[in-house]
Amino acid sequence: MSSGSTIVSSDKSGRTFKHEEELPKLPLPKLCDTLQRLKESLEPLYYADGYYQHPLDPEQIEKLSSIIRDFEENPVSEKLQSKLQSYHDTRDCYLDELHLDINNQTSTREIQDDVLPRNPFLVLADDALPNITQADRSAVLVHSAARFISALKQDLLPPDINATNGKPLSMAPFLNLFGTTRSPVFQRGEVENFDLNKPYTASDLEDPDYSSDEDDNDEPTQKDFDDRKRKHEEDIFTGNGITIKRHPDSKHILIISRGQYYTLEVLDSTNKIIYTAAELTTIFNHIIKDSSGIEKSTALGSLTSHSFRNWKYARKRLQKRYPNELHRIDSALFVLVLDESQEETTNDGDDTADISQMFNRTITERDKKCTSANCKRVFYGTSIINSKGHQVGSCVSRWYDKLQLVVTADAKATVIWDSFTCDGSVVLRFTSEIYTESVLRLARDVNAGDPQFSLWPNVTQMDPETKKLMTATISADGGGPSEIDPKLVVNKIDWSFSNILNTHVHLSETKLADLISKYDIVRASIPLGRRSAQRLGVKPDSMVQVALQIAHYALYGRMVFGLEPVSTRGFKNSRSSFINIQSQALLELCQLFISSSIDGTDKLDKFIQTCETHNNMVKHAKSGVGYEKHFNALKYLFKFHDHFGIHLSGDESSAAKDLFENPLVLPFSQPELIVANCGNAATTTFGITPAVPHGFGIGYIIKDDQVDLTVTSQFRQGDRLMFMLSWVLGEIRSYWRMSRGTSHNKTGVKISPVVDKLYEMDNAVNNPPKRNGHTVNGSRKTSSSSQVNLNRYGGFFDLEGHIDSRNISKTPSMKNLQKTFNGLTMSADNDHSSSAVSVPTEKEKLNTGHEILQIQPREVASNGLEADDETDIEIVAGNADGTSSSASSATSLNSKKRNVINSRFDIDFDRSRVGRKVATLDQ
């Protein structure tokens, strides 16, 4: 989900889905390759006891190898692979026929009540206007979102293009973004036969037999047995099923404020925008006021955060009792949440402000806690209990089954999405473009509403006269412009819950409050980013992923199974795939990194090699032959082999069960680390939730000079993990500096012997005697071999600078850049005290030449580090004999042209324009 993986086509006239048919099929990997990569991903987890360079456990590894080998040699593997091959030959994607959108409980087990909703979130940057209100920010973003949706529905949205190879990406995932919802799969008659008067019991969550309302005294017939068998088979296939419901004709949004539910039409029948941003502000202010006057709110949204079985039971009851209301929610384009929470601050008074200047570290820690608290409130809201014991926090104002846009009372905006229905790269584009459109509104305002200042200039508003008939009322004076009456255009959903449903809602709310109390979100920024990775010669994503594994190993002394999502939208009907982060090479690096068995240079080399291995894994997955989807498809076919018409013998079933249900393979379906990269300049924070209660969910955004990370965990040391990550990356940088410093005196760069000789000759003939820093006229020593200055760093040509120029150099500091340029600019002075010195003759030019300013190499300290790695280059005046004077003396009154090389050749050019090689930013 990297932010740099896609670009938007500049062809504004292009149709949104014009490339879909030309996309290639997702390849079907070879069975042997998938099993081999599965084995390699699991091996680093099983090693002998001990902390220092412990070897792999031979007994565990042999068991793992044996079960994989037995499965591969058994006919069951060929039967399952053949079924996938038949789907691959006859479908656009071999995964299409597997109904994975109905049953997604194969890749990860259902965790009972102990994990947060698996919804990633992106926090948007602040609005371009300071001190904007909640209603105004909501109106601007909703108006931008409506324009985005209108462009998509009218086929005006430019298609995505791969930034690396220029190939088109699938736009099909955009169809799952709006007007869709996550929903449990119900069997035939399950909702219709549900008894609303039946009290809620725990058995409702476990009993799959939904014919309990039948008369138990009736003697069952053969037909009853057949029906029950068929229902049982259906329940095996769909009992834990989750599917996606689509409503492509949706025109309205759902608004939640203080637990109250409202709907608002935003598109007309031709997908034109109904309201302006100003009109939306009026509507949202009305909703905020209306919801604030109601003391009792409903925590209905907390039902979407409950475990699968509780969620399914609640949806079934709501669908039976409130079918129309639930349909209005499910079919909404997206959800706007008007969160009433405010940002926490660190200032408790003037005393604290004074303390902050004296104790920066203490305040920094407090700021860090406040930043983490703000991440919590924009994600799952606040949990506040009033004097009556009722939940009045904003955590009840969420709906995790759908795409959500959350805007807090202090105008902080966040996009939260369901990872089952929505793709992360698609959400990132939506988030980025609605933010960009919100900024472009300022350009439209100062250009008389010019539509060219928009990402979608062809998207238009509804005709004013038509809108007047639909929504507006005449102002009080009868002659003024029409105004929107919010009461006429906003529809409020009224609930009248029974005691049974009230009980279930209450239990779901208390469970959610417990989860909020259990989980911690830590946000940290580490000052190494894209430029640092470029200097190392590695990909930024690989640098962060590998360093995180080292940090985890240094903290806990063991390797864990971790997954990273990789986009596969370059293929038909494909979204993403997971790759395993851990490998044998990474395990060896972790063991060596925390030891003293090798020096820093070798650790750096090993780190770079491991980053390259990780990058190759990413490329492999992007090519469509990743093993994660393939292995899950094989596992899914075996689980429902009867449904798919695959007949297996007892021996075949046993061989498959030994692999798919083996505890050694269990970490594959229960990853302890989920680490993902998603974000760009329009976002400030990206967070994901862990897959298991004891795991970490780590989201990060890579910037030029820093990495912003968000760690979500339950009873874990997220802040300490970030401390270890900072330490690891700091060590890597110090190793790089040390390696760079010691390489100054190495002949790692090949220079032509002829060029070397010319440098020596040029230095040899330029050692005239000096007096007070100036060449004495008419006096010149005869050069000889004993007088040749062979110091390659002491001559007037600095070879070290040329060697450095072949390496990627540090980006110059911007702090003193102007000062440096001013120092390099030479000015001629007309006050000459000696014509022999200030105005040399042509003969003198040939004999002695002119002096130039030299850019001397930075000194390397005894510890191998650069003496001043973060400051600008020091400017000194260099003479032919290797002596130097300060930059101030170099600009003395007796100098004529100080930018002429001290050579027998008269060469005049601006030396300040010559610098070291600058690192490019193309990563």
From Swiss-Prot:
Residues 1-11, 774-787 have a biased composition (Polar residues). (R)-carnitine binds at residue 576. CoA binds at residues 529-541, 567. One of its GO terms (molecular function) is carnitine O-acetyltransferase activity. GO terms for biological process: alcohol metabolic process; carnitine metabolic process; fatty acid metabolic process. It is an enzyme of class 2 (transferase). Pfam families: Carn_acyltransf (PF00755). Residues 204-219 have a biased composition (Acidic residues). The modification Phosphoserine is found at residue 783. It catalyses: (R)-carnitine + acetyl-CoA = O-acetyl-(R)-carnitine + CoA. Residues 12-21, 220-232 have a biased composition (Basic and acidic residues). Keywords: Acetylation, Acyltransferase, Cytoplasm, Fatty acid metabolism, Lipid metabolism, Phosphoprotein, Transferase, Transport. One of its GO terms (cellular component) is cytosol. SUPFAM superfamilies: CoA-dependent acyltransferases. It is found in: Cytoplasm. The modification N-acetylserine is found at residue 2. It comes from the Eukaryota. Its EC number is 2.3.1.7. Carnitine O-acetyltransferase involved in the shutteling of acetyl-CoA in the cell. Present with 319 molecules/cell in log phase SD medium. This is Carnitine O-acetyltransferase YAT2. The gene is YAT2.
